Amino acid sequence: MSTNNMSDPRRPNKVLRYKPPPSECNPALDDPTPDYMNLLGMIFSMCGLMLKLKWCAWVAVYCSFISFANSRSSEDTKQMMSSFMLSISAVVMSYLQNPQPMTPPW
């Protein structure tokens, strides 16, 4: 057994324990895409509700899906779910007020 320890090239006094870097110095962990999409979803939801534009309501649903897909599991989901429900309600209300199919905005 002592021969095995003598042939081991590792030096136990040089072993350093791994410490993860703080999140403030790692810009890759601070992805602002979910926050931007959440804000855009709320803006488009309000435009869809107030201006009765169906395409704005659908863009809000799309932005909410992107925000949900890009978020981290450690984030609080209350704001994201409220944005998602606001966008769904914008679509529902715009089709309740005018049930005709959506006309393209161009």
UniProtKB/Swiss-Prot annotation:
Its main location: endoplasmic reticulum. It comes from Homo sapiens (Human). It is linked to Neurodevelopmental disorder with variable familial hypercholanemia: An autosomal recessive disorder characterized by global developmental delay, motor and speech delay, impaired intellectual development, intractable itching, and signs of liver dysfunction including increased serum bile acids, hepatomegaly, elevated liver enzymes, and gallstones. It is a multi-pass membrane protein. Keywords: Acetylation, Chaperone, Disease variant, Endoplasmic reticulum, Intellectual disability, Membrane, Transmembrane, Transmembrane helix. This is PAT complex subunit Asterix. InterPro entries: ASTER. Residues 1-29 are annotated as: Disordered. GO terms for molecular function: protein folding chaperone. Residues 2-32, 71-74 are cytoplasmic. GO terms for cellular component: endoplasmic reticulum membrane; multi-pass translocon complex; protein folding chaperone complex. The keyword Ribonucleoprotein does not apply. One of its GO terms (biological process) is multi-pass transmembrane protein insertion into ER membrane. Component of the multi-pass translocon (MPT) complex that mediates insertion of multi-pass membrane proteins into the lipid bilayer of membranes. The MPT complex takes over after the SEC61 complex: following membrane insertion of the first few transmembrane segments of proteins by the SEC61 complex, the MPT complex occludes the lateral gate of the SEC61 complex to promote insertion of subsequent transmembrane regions.
